[in-house]
Amino acid sequence: MFDLVIKNSRLVGKSGEYNIGVKDKKIREITKKSIKSENIIDIKSNYLMPGFIDPHVHFRDPGLTRKEDFRTGSEAAAHGGFATVIDMPNTLPKTNTYDALKEKMNLASKKSVVNFYLQAGHNSLDEMTRMMELNPVSFKVFMDLETDESLEEIFKNLGKLKDSTSYNGLVAAHCEKRSIVSEKTQELEESNDPIDYSYARPHISEDESVKQTIELARKNNLRLHICHLSSKNALNIARKNNISYEFTPHHLLLDNSAYNTYGTMVKTNPPLRPKDVCVKISDIDENSIIGTDHAPHTLEEKQKGVFTSSPGIPALETVASLLLTEVNKGNLSLELIPKILSKNAARVFELESKGEIAVGKDADFTVIDLKRKGKFDISTFKTKAEYSPFDGWEYEGAPVMTIVNGSVVFDDL
């Protein structure tokens, strides 16, 4: 007898309908035959996908919980079809000490309704060695906050950490060149035109930073994952060097003309790019990863000046439907959805029990109604953020149920 049976499931790439048997939070059977359980969910011929994984969220907890916390952030994740998230280390305090990492693990364990993993911030070699006792999935480096000299030291220490501990050598990098951003920002920081923010952090700063980061990673025998790629040239550099990367929905669907419509509501780092250099839906391939960079702020923080307002866009509750709409438009293959929203992130971040619907994997699932139509309404979102450039956009296709470790955490079936 199974703890849970999910019946009448369509699986991407397979014909017919399947029944999935779950026991002890694991997938134990995948069959077209009838199987028994006292707990049966009939998903009515909708698509069953491996639970979505977002490798890039900012849940602001601890220290910045006016913007978001692990409860509201994880509820937003579940609402958006995500069973697993990876949280970033730029909280208060920064998650770059053993004590801070331990504190965040404890509070997330109490608040989160989805699976969570944590990235750690860099520190001294001794402190990072202590942090490895808590198994962060990777270390995050904000290239735009560091000088070239400090970056050399940071990557050297990460290389030493890999040689002396269980650290797998994965570095997640925010790639913008500090010197270029500083120079261009000084030229434009008096501007009141939001579009100038994109020129203050030009695509060349990302392109050059990606090159530098690849060199530093290779020099120190580290694996590299590039966050929120926004420049087409930077994407080509990453692909040429076989480097993993992620796209955000806003960089794929908006260019910098959106600043004329939404103002600082679409301010983000890296910024939205001019149409001739930005990444697009057509750039998604079977190795791509979607990372939302879900980065909520208060309205007050978003409504300040062009250069004083806070950068960041909430995205967990819109991304799946935005991509499924592109599927329905014929701009994106349905077969790519479980790869870019689950399988590829599980591979890169070594979440070995996740990312696929297969016997022995964790019972994390996202149910997709490919024909569900609606209009985004920020007032119905779980996030604390009260803004989104996609508020009011119509969509076709939506996550209608999220299951985490065999338990339903969101149900709109």
Predicted segments, located by residue:
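Histidine/acidic residue-rich metal-binding segments in metalloenzymes
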Residues: 126-290
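Divalent metal-coordination and catalytic microenvironments
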Residues: 9, 25, 45, 56, ...
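N-terminal metal-binding scaffold of metallo-dependent hydrolase/deaminase domains
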Residues: 1-35
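Active-site metal-binding motif and surrounding structural segment of the metallo-beta-lactamase
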Residues: 33-49
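His/Asp/Glu-enriched, well-ordered alpha-helical/loop segment
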Residues: 194-221, 287-289, 295-368
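C-terminal cap of metal-dependent C-N hydrolases
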Residues: 359-413
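Divalent metal-binding segments
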Residues: 58-67, 86-98, 118-126, 142-149, ...
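Metal-associated gating/positioning segment near the N- to mid-region
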Residues: 46-111
